[in-house]
Protein backbone atom coordinates (compact mmCIF):
# COMPACT_ATOMS: atom_id res chain seq x y z
CA UNK A 1 0.00 0.00 0.00
CA UNK A 2 3.03 2.32 -0.05
CA UNK A 3 1.82 3.74 -3.32
CA UNK A 4 -0.96 5.48 -1.41
CA UNK A 5 1.22 7.01 1.28
CA UNK A 6 0.90 10.75 1.21
CA UNK A 7 -0.72 10.65 -2.20
CA UNK A 8 -2.95 13.60 -2.96
CA UNK A 9 -4.54 14.07 -6.34
CA UNK A 10 -6.56 17.22 -6.90
CA UNK A 11 -8.51 16.78 -10.10
CA UNK A 12 -10.61 19.92 -10.12
CA UNK A 13 -10.08 22.98 -8.00
CA UNK A 14 -12.14 26.09 -7.38
CA UNK A 15 -15.35 25.26 -9.20
CA UNK A 16 -16.98 28.26 -7.58
CA UNK A 17 -14.81 31.19 -6.66
CA UNK A 18 -17.00 34.22 -7.07
CA UNK A 19 -16.90 36.75 -4.25
CA UNK A 20 -18.78 35.68 -1.18
CA UNK A 21 -19.21 32.08 -2.33
CA UNK A 22 -17.88 28.80 -1.02
CA UNK A 23 -14.93 27.36 -2.91
CA UNK A 24 -15.29 23.78 -4.13
CA UNK A 25 -12.48 21.29 -4.61
CA UNK A 26 -12.89 17.81 -6.04
CA UNK A 27 -10.10 15.59 -4.81
CA UNK A 28 -9.14 11.93 -4.84
CA UNK A 29 -8.35 10.62 -1.37
CA UNK A 30 -6.37 7.38 -0.94
CA UNK A 31 -7.93 4.53 1.01
CA UNK A 32 -5.50 1.93 2.27
CA UNK A 33 -8.45 -0.14 3.52
CA UNK A 34 -9.87 -0.44 0.00
CA UNK A 35 -6.65 -0.13 -1.99
CA UNK A 36 -7.94 2.67 -4.19
CA UNK A 37 -8.75 6.35 -4.33
CA UNK A 38 -12.16 7.80 -3.52
CA UNK A 39 -13.58 10.99 -5.01
CA UNK A 40 -14.45 13.63 -2.44
CA UNK A 41 -15.91 17.11 -2.90
CA UNK A 42 -14.68 19.63 -0.33
CA UNK A 43 -16.51 22.92 0.21
CA UNK A 44 -14.49 25.68 1.85
CA UNK A 45 -16.30 28.72 3.26
CA UNK A 46 -15.44 31.99 1.59
CA UNK A 47 -13.80 33.18 4.80
CA UNK A 48 -11.35 30.26 4.77
CA UNK A 49 -9.05 31.94 2.25
CA UNK A 50 -9.27 35.34 3.95
CA UNK A 51 -8.50 34.19 7.49
CA UNK A 52 -5.36 32.04 7.36
CA UNK A 53 -5.06 31.79 11.14
CA UNK A 54 -8.57 30.48 11.78
CA UNK A 55 -9.44 26.80 12.19
CA UNK A 56 -12.84 25.58 11.05
CA UNK A 57 -15.26 22.86 12.12
CA UNK A 58 -16.07 20.17 9.56
CA UNK A 59 -19.39 18.66 8.47
CA UNK A 60 -19.23 15.31 6.69
CA UNK A 61 -22.13 14.96 4.22
CA UNK A 62 -23.12 11.48 3.00
CA UNK A 63 -25.20 11.06 -0.15
CA UNK A 64 -28.07 8.66 -0.73
CA UNK A 65 -28.29 5.50 -2.84
CA UNK A 66 -27.50 6.14 -6.48
CA UNK A 67 -26.09 9.61 -5.85
CA UNK A 68 -22.46 10.69 -5.58
CA UNK A 69 -20.02 13.10 -3.97
CA UNK A 70 -21.54 16.13 -5.73
CA UNK A 71 -25.03 15.73 -4.22
CA UNK A 72 -24.58 18.08 -1.26
CA UNK A 73 -22.42 20.53 -3.22
CA UNK A 74 -25.52 22.43 -4.31
CA UNK A 75 -26.70 25.95 -3.51
CA UNK A 76 -27.97 24.85 -0.08
CA UNK A 77 -24.71 23.15 0.78
CA UNK A 78 -22.62 26.10 -0.35
CA UNK A 79 -24.84 28.54 1.54
CA UNK A 80 -24.70 26.35 4.63
CA UNK A 81 -20.92 26.25 4.51
CA UNK A 82 -20.62 30.02 4.15
CA UNK A 83 -23.23 30.97 6.74
CA UNK A 84 -22.22 28.24 9.16
CA UNK A 85 -18.52 28.91 8.90
CA UNK A 86 -17.62 25.26 8.48
CA UNK A 87 -15.91 23.04 5.92
CA UNK A 88 -18.16 20.60 4.06
CA UNK A 89 -16.71 17.23 3.09
CA UNK A 90 -18.72 15.06 0.68
CA UNK A 91 -17.25 11.60 -0.02
CA UNK A 92 -18.37 9.29 -2.79
CA UNK A 93 -20.03 6.12 -1.50
CA UNK A 94 -19.78 4.04 -4.69
CA UNK A 95 -23.46 4.48 -5.39
CA UNK A 96 -24.98 2.03 -2.92
CA UNK A 97 -22.39 1.15 -0.26
CA UNK A 98 -24.70 2.10 2.63
CA UNK A 99 -21.52 3.45 4.24
CA UNK A 100 -20.73 0.01 5.68
CA UNK A 101 -17.61 -2.02 6.06
CA UNK A 102 -19.43 -4.75 4.16
CA UNK A 103 -19.36 -8.15 5.90
CA UNK A 104 -19.68 -9.90 2.53
CA UNK A 105 -17.59 -7.69 0.23
CA UNK A 106 -14.06 -6.97 1.52
CA UNK A 107 -13.58 -4.38 -1.23
CA UNK A 108 -16.14 -2.10 0.45
CA UNK A 109 -14.79 -0.50 3.62
CA UNK A 110 -16.64 2.79 3.65
CA UNK A 111 -17.07 3.00 7.42
CA UNK A 112 -13.32 2.74 7.84
CA UNK A 113 -12.73 5.17 5.01
CA UNK A 114 -15.02 7.93 6.27
CA UNK A 115 -14.63 7.62 10.04
CA UNK A 116 -10.88 7.03 10.05
CA UNK A 117 -9.02 7.56 6.79
CA UNK A 118 -10.95 10.55 5.46
CA UNK A 119 -11.12 12.32 8.82
CA UNK A 120 -7.35 11.94 9.22
CA UNK A 121 -6.74 13.13 5.66
CA UNK A 122 -8.96 16.20 6.03
CA UNK A 123 -7.38 17.15 9.36
CA UNK A 124 -3.90 16.86 7.84
CA UNK A 125 -4.70 18.95 4.77
CA UNK A 126 -7.07 21.69 5.97
CA UNK A 127 -7.19 24.02 8.97
CA UNK A 128 -9.74 22.09 10.98
CA UNK A 129 -10.85 21.93 14.58
CA UNK A 130 -9.54 18.41 14.89
CA UNK A 131 -11.72 17.02 17.67
CA UNK A 132 -15.27 15.73 18.08
CA UNK A 133 -16.45 19.19 19.14
CA UNK A 134 -15.38 20.38 15.70
CA UNK A 135 -17.00 17.60 13.66
CA UNK A 136 -20.53 16.69 12.63
CA UNK A 137 -21.98 14.22 10.16
CA UNK A 138 -25.18 14.26 8.11
CA UNK A 139 -26.80 12.64 5.11
CA UNK A 140 -30.06 11.82 3.41
CA UNK A 141 -31.73 8.41 2.95
CA UNK A 142 -28.82 5.96 2.66
CA UNK A 143 -26.71 8.90 3.84
CA UNK A 144 -28.99 9.48 6.83
CA UNK A 145 -28.49 5.85 7.74
CA UNK A 146 -24.74 6.36 7.23
CA UNK A 147 -24.67 9.44 9.44
CA UNK A 148 -26.39 7.53 12.25
CA UNK A 149 -24.35 4.37 11.72
CA UNK A 150 -21.03 6.20 11.84
CA UNK A 151 -22.13 8.74 14.44
CA UNK A 152 -23.43 6.09 16.85
CA UNK A 153 -20.35 3.89 16.42
CA UNK A 154 -17.68 6.60 16.40
CA UNK A 155 -18.78 8.88 19.22
CA UNK A 156 -15.23 10.08 19.82
CA UNK A 157 -14.97 11.31 16.24
CA UNK A 158 -18.30 13.02 15.48
CA UNK A 159 -19.94 15.35 17.99
CA UNK A 160 -23.29 15.88 16.27
CA UNK A 161 -25.47 13.91 13.84
CA UNK A 162 -28.05 15.15 11.34
CA UNK A 163 -30.29 12.36 10.05
CA UNK A 164 -32.37 13.36 7.02
CA UNK A 165 -35.05 10.70 6.33
CA UNK A 166 -32.52 7.95 6.97
CA UNK A 167 -33.07 4.29 6.18
CA UNK A 168 -32.37 3.33 9.77
CA UNK A 169 -34.11 -0.07 9.62
CA UNK A 170 -34.38 -1.35 6.07
CA UNK A 171 -35.52 -4.85 7.04
CA UNK A 172 -39.15 -3.85 6.52
CA UNK A 173 -38.50 -2.86 2.88
CA UNK A 174 -37.95 -6.32 1.39
CA UNK A 175 -39.15 -5.41 -2.09
CA UNK A 176 -36.44 -2.75 -2.39
CA UNK A 177 -33.42 -4.63 -1.03
CA UNK A 178 -32.06 -5.56 -4.46
CA UNK A 179 -32.54 -2.21 -6.18
CA UNK A 180 -31.07 -0.39 -3.16
CA UNK A 181 -27.96 -2.58 -3.28
CA UNK A 182 -28.44 -4.04 0.20
CA UNK A 183 -27.97 -7.66 -0.86
CA UNK A 184 -24.52 -6.73 -2.19
CA UNK A 185 -23.70 -5.08 1.15
CA UNK A 186 -25.13 -7.57 3.65
CA UNK A 187 -25.75 -10.78 1.71
CA UNK A 188 -28.89 -12.85 1.46
CA UNK A 189 -31.31 -11.97 4.24
CA UNK A 190 -32.56 -15.46 5.09
CA UNK A 191 -29.01 -16.79 5.37
CA UNK A 192 -27.70 -13.75 7.25
CA UNK A 193 -30.50 -12.50 9.50
CA UNK A 194 -28.14 -11.91 12.43
CA UNK A 195 -25.78 -9.93 10.19
CA UNK A 196 -28.64 -7.75 8.97
CA UNK A 197 -29.88 -7.14 12.51
CA UNK A 198 -26.41 -6.15 13.71
CA UNK A 199 -26.10 -3.69 10.83
CA UNK A 200 -29.30 -1.75 11.52
CA UNK A 201 -29.03 1.72 13.08
CA UNK A 202 -31.93 0.90 15.40
CA UNK A 203 -29.82 -1.94 16.83
CA UNK A 204 -26.95 0.46 17.51
CA UNK A 205 -29.40 3.01 18.93
CA UNK A 206 -30.52 0.54 21.59
CA UNK A 207 -26.97 0.58 22.97
CA UNK A 208 -26.89 4.36 23.47
CA UNK A 209 -27.13 6.11 26.80
CA UNK A 210 -28.11 9.69 27.48
CA UNK A 211 -25.31 12.06 26.53
CA UNK A 212 -23.63 9.68 24.10
CA UNK A 213 -24.78 11.54 20.98
CA UNK A 214 -26.31 14.79 19.75
CA UNK A 215 -28.89 13.75 17.17
CA UNK A 216 -31.40 15.62 15.03
CA UNK A 217 -33.73 13.64 12.76
CA UNK A 218 -35.73 15.44 10.06
CA UNK A 219 -38.30 13.35 8.18
CA UNK A 220 -41.48 14.12 6.28
CA UNK A 221 -44.86 12.57 6.98
CA UNK A 222 -44.97 11.60 3.31
CA UNK A 223 -41.87 9.38 3.39
CA UNK A 224 -41.51 5.61 3.10
CA UNK A 225 -38.87 5.78 5.85
CA UNK A 226 -41.19 7.62 8.25
CA UNK A 227 -41.97 4.60 10.43
CA UNK A 228 -38.30 3.59 10.50
CA UNK A 229 -37.41 6.98 11.95
CA UNK A 230 -40.32 6.89 14.38
CA UNK A 231 -38.99 3.54 15.56
CA UNK A 232 -35.58 5.13 16.16
CA UNK A 233 -37.32 7.95 18.04
CA UNK A 234 -39.21 5.45 20.23
CA UNK A 235 -36.07 3.50 21.10
CA UNK A 236 -34.19 6.62 22.15
CA UNK A 237 -37.17 7.99 24.06
CA UNK A 238 -37.72 4.73 25.94
CA UNK A 239 -34.03 4.70 26.90
CA UNK A 240 -34.20 8.38 27.92
CA UNK A 241 -31.60 9.43 25.36
CA UNK A 242 -32.04 13.15 24.65
CA UNK A 243 -32.43 13.93 20.94
CA UNK A 244 -34.53 15.97 18.52
CA UNK A 245 -37.06 14.36 16.18
CA UNK A 246 -38.70 16.71 13.69
CA UNK A 247 -41.51 15.64 11.35
CA UNK A 248 -42.52 17.95 8.52
CA UNK A 249 -46.02 17.54 7.15
CA UNK A 250 -46.16 16.35 3.56
CA UNK A 251 -48.66 14.86 1.17
CA UNK A 252 -50.04 11.38 1.78
CA UNK A 253 -47.94 9.93 -1.02
CA UNK A 254 -45.12 8.00 0.69
CA UNK A 255 -42.57 9.48 -1.72
CA UNK A 256 -43.62 13.12 -1.53
CA UNK A 257 -41.05 13.91 1.16
CA UNK A 258 -38.25 11.64 -0.10
CA UNK A 259 -36.94 14.04 -2.72
CA UNK A 260 -33.99 16.32 -3.33
CA UNK A 261 -36.12 19.47 -2.78
CA UNK A 262 -37.18 18.13 0.62
CA UNK A 263 -33.58 17.16 1.43
CA UNK A 264 -32.45 20.70 0.69
CA UNK A 265 -35.05 22.14 3.08
CA UNK A 266 -34.09 19.62 5.74
CA UNK A 267 -30.38 20.27 5.22
CA UNK A 268 -30.87 23.96 6.00
CA UNK A 269 -32.41 22.95 9.35
CA UNK A 270 -29.60 20.50 10.06
CA UNK A 271 -26.96 23.11 9.26
CA UNK A 272 -28.55 25.48 11.77
CA UNK A 273 -28.42 22.70 14.36
CA UNK A 274 -24.73 22.20 13.63
CA UNK A 275 -23.98 25.94 13.78
CA UNK A 276 -25.41 26.06 17.28
CA UNK A 277 -23.33 23.07 18.30
CA UNK A 278 -20.11 24.50 16.88
CA UNK A 279 -20.60 27.97 18.37
CA UNK A 280 -22.11 27.17 21.77
CA UNK A 281 -21.19 23.55 22.42
CA UNK A 282 -24.90 22.75 22.75
CA UNK A 283 -26.85 21.07 19.98
CA UNK A 284 -30.25 22.61 19.37
CA UNK A 285 -32.40 24.73 17.09
CA UNK A 286 -32.87 27.73 19.38
Each predicted region: which residue ranges?
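N-terminal secretory signal peptides that target proteins for export/translocation
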Residues: 1-3
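Bacterial N-terminal signal peptides
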Residues: 6-16
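Non-catalytic cap/lid and distal C-terminal segments of serine-dependent acyl enzymes
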Residues: 20-286
